[in-house]
Amino acid sequence: MAQTKFRSFYSRMWQKIFSLPINPKLDPKDIKGEYLNFLMRNKDWIYDLYFTCRMPPFTQDAMGDVFFTDDMEMQVIEMALWLSDITKIPLSATFNNIYVRPDQKGLDMFISNFKQLYDVGVKIVTLPHTSWVLTGQIQKEYPELYIKNTILREVTRPNEIVQLAQAGFNYINLDRDLMRDRDRLIEIKEAKEYCAEQGYPVKLS
């Protein structure tokens, strides 16, 4: 009986394969209506809900979009927290602007400002700078944080998987062009297995 329950739980965890966006430009009525209904129907397949977050030093996203006012930013965060509370799907804050300077000043600013999200339950984050993660400062301040890399870094090689895992990333987004390269995907899978053997397991997407 216990083994059956464990297998069922394990199966449910592995079927959570989709990371879905919370689009800040959607009408709140649509989010609370059709989108919420969709999430409730399919939440067993959804890994997390991600939203682009604007806070210093990430005041623009990777495309330079600055449509947020402070009030709009708070509305997005509040809506994300509400969706997560209703659906029980974890939230993921996305900071993907690779053009933000990866210096210590920016890292200190991020660590200070992220506390407001961490304290309300946001425990997954996408970050653009490997050098920040490599310092261990973020992990020390936020020990329960699960860290993703940004897809904008275009990870395509097995050695990059190993380097990112060693740096401290828990989840690695692969470049989408790899979907057409079966041989390279096999090499990527072997790199993932190597990371697990060395004590720094990662999830790939």
Describe every region a protein language model picked out.
Residues 146-150, 155-205:
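Catalytic alpha/beta core domains of metabolic enzymes, predominantly
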Residues 1-13:
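Extended hydrophobic/aromatic-rich secondary-structure runs
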Residues 3-6, 20-38, 42-169:
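Active-site beta->alpha loop and helix N-cap motifs at the rims of alpha/beta catalytic domains
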Residues 14-18:
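Extreme N-terminal starter segment of soluble prokaryotic enzymes
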Residues 8-11, 39-41, 195-198:
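A general structural signal for short secondary-structure junctions and capping/turn motifs
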